[in-house]
Amino acid sequence: LKFPEQKRVFSMIPALHDAEFIRYGVMHRNTFLDSPRILNSDFSMKENANIFFAGQITGVEGYMESGASGLIAGINAVRRLNNIETITLPKETMIGALSRYIADESVKDFQPMGANIGILPPLEEKIRDKRERAAKHSACALDALEKVKVDFALA
């Protein structure tokens, strides 16, 4: 609500009718890139692969997601600087799935997204129990990360 409207609404409350408001509230705005048109899944720019973005501006939502994207972007910036192939984590991992989401050009109305099980690839078998399903997704992610360690000669 705009400031005059906030004053009007709050003043309708009998106990606040004569209150003096020192500061009114402001709405949080989330500014973000149209990442599918701008970024690759390694968090580098399509137009200039030497520039990396990370965090909320890329369209990942959440502290952990923003931090993880920063780690991947930072690792990839160093790898690019040293002429080493950049890493995109597997889609079975949450940050890998998010990095693919932000770079997916088929997404027409791009909106930020946080970590959620729905962006991971479906499991081969249906598992009804939520904890069991989460454990299976976790095992798949760890298996996929082992392959990354081999593919990119990481120890």
Could you describe each region identified by the protein language model?
Residues 57, 76-155:
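Glycine- and aromatic-enriched mobile tails/lids
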Residues 6, 71-74, 142:
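Short, hydrophobic/amphipathic alpha-helical packing segments
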Residues 2-60, 67-69, 87-104, 110-120:
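A glycine-rich dinucleotide-binding beta-alpha-beta segment and adjacent secondary-structure elements
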